[in-house]
Amino acid sequence: MRRGVSPVIAGRNAKRLEQLKTEYPTIEARVTSTDDSRSLDDAFASIAVVINCAGPFLDTSAPLIEAALRNGVHYLDIAAEQAAVIAAFERFSEAAQRARIIVAPALGFYGGLTDLLVTAAMHDWTHIYECEIAVALDSWHPTRGTRLTGERNTGPRWFFAQGNLERRDPLPSRDWEFPQPFGRQEVASLALAEAILIPRHVQVADIRFYLNKLSIAELSNPNTPPPVPQDATGRSAQTFLVDVVVRKGQETRRAIARGRDIYAVTAPIVVEAATRILDGRCNVIGVQAAGELFDARDFLIALGSDQLTVQFGRPVS
């Protein structure tokens, strides 16, 4: 609504939708369910782009993409699960081309943001040897959706190494020297959507993604409470830093993003994407990664410093 569009909210919980309408009385609400294709078609009527923020995406992505295809509606989601992202590319690429729509999975903090940062760090490079992405969170209080996704996301983990997507064990934990205020942190290797998205449009041999173990410990603890809003926008007190290093030969380039609340920053990312699709700044169709769709640096800057602070430079040795 802040961007001047007229959103329609849709979901399976009629009571929750009514609560949202009480808070935002001008918004239209539509009850729908992923196991009812007719209700999905009704929900997508007269819609230009749908943003799926209802996980687990292993369950919701496919039926919503199918509905988007039937109704000629662009589809965006914020999945981090590799299997859901792989399925979007493998199952729906040709159909999305025929329907002349954009399907853009993983446009959230994990996946879309890091893909854009890698693309922006490369700048005018056409290929790189490797990229390393290290994320530091000062805490991780998971939402109920994150908990449900973790329970559902039990499939194989894929890593991108030596130019191939392959199933293997994670790399050993290591230390990463983050910029302040995080400093040196022990990080663990994880397999998320980055390994699927970045090779779609970047010629690269190796992709390594790390997350600081402090935040993993909180996520793994079933007693860690959900996030609590700390300001008028609903953001929690959580802070994050994403450190991206790309290498080509002996040269290195870097992009660093700082902000608050990994959940809250996802909203401006996916809404910026939807806005650019609606106003015609995307001239491609089909299933696409964020770095393919948008001018990465322009996109990141457009988010505004109140959401995300981004800088580019040389890595710290």
Whereabouts are the PLM-identified features?
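Conserved Rossmann-fold cofactor-binding substructure of NAD(P)-dependent oxidoreductases
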Residues: 30-60
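C-terminal active-site/capping subdomain that shapes the small-molecule cofactor and substrate pocket
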Residues: 217-317
